[in-house]
Amino acid sequence: VADTAHASIDNALHILGLQSLVVPTGPDCRLTGHAIRAAVGHRDDIAIVVAAGGSTNAGVIDDLAGCAEVAAELGAWFHVDGAYGLTAMLLPEMRERYAGIERADSFIVDPHKWMFAPAGSCALVYRQPWLARQTHTQHGPYIDVLRTDDHAYNPCDLGYQLTRRASGLPVWFAMALHGLDAHRDAIRHGLVLAQRMAAALDACAATELIMQPELGVVLFRRTGWHRDEWARWAATLLRDQVAFVAPTTYRGEPVGRLVFMHPRTPLAIVDELMASLTG
């Protein structure tokens, strides 16, 4: 896993009783196949390779093709964490950036993030679902009596959670009602806002853009600001109902982090945020 991987990845490995081999990323926060090879060396005990289809902290899409190649060489399971960013694949102009996703053994995407579905809507997709059924199917006389068809699809056999809601139904209704084009337009709006914010930060003498955004996340510095200044800035924006922002760290340094997702966020928010940083 990358040093930028979501905390839930390490937690899942801990539950499984597996140790994580943390692979350092460079200034661009992107996990690459080359970096994995360098970290693994001659080890032959690698079971899983996890890459991100849009990291949480920086919105970076890992080198999925390179990571998939290394996973195949190691005979390891290749999982892509696309909980936040994989939805951007709905945009034709973004699909090339996800080259390699087709080689994943499994991937995850959360419609409750960038598809605006109710909280808890999550899709875990397997290349070979029978492996998941073999792993997760629970048995008991009170359960087996319901299995009258060997080919019947039951989500409870594809994960460790037994009783569950039909959380995919609201996603289907939203897509059926609004259509894919409406979802594409909403996602694209977030990308446009991120690019405009990045350009404004890059043009300002008081701020420094850390990296060009790939998705809707923008990381930046403000000259002379430290942790306390970032905290006050975030609190003021929330108090004034301008925006809810949560500063983060980049390589241990407190920095600003903006995430653009809501399709009704006006373009004028860029000017408001810049005024709050320079006023």
What residues fall within each predicted segment?
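Short, glycine-/Ser/Thr-/acidic-enriched flexible segments
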Residues: 4-6, 27-28, 54-56, 85, ...
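PLP-dependent enzyme catalytic core of the Aspartate aminotransferase-like
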Residues: 74, 250-279
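Short amphipathic alpha-helices in soluble, non-transmembrane regions
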Residues: 229-238, 270-278
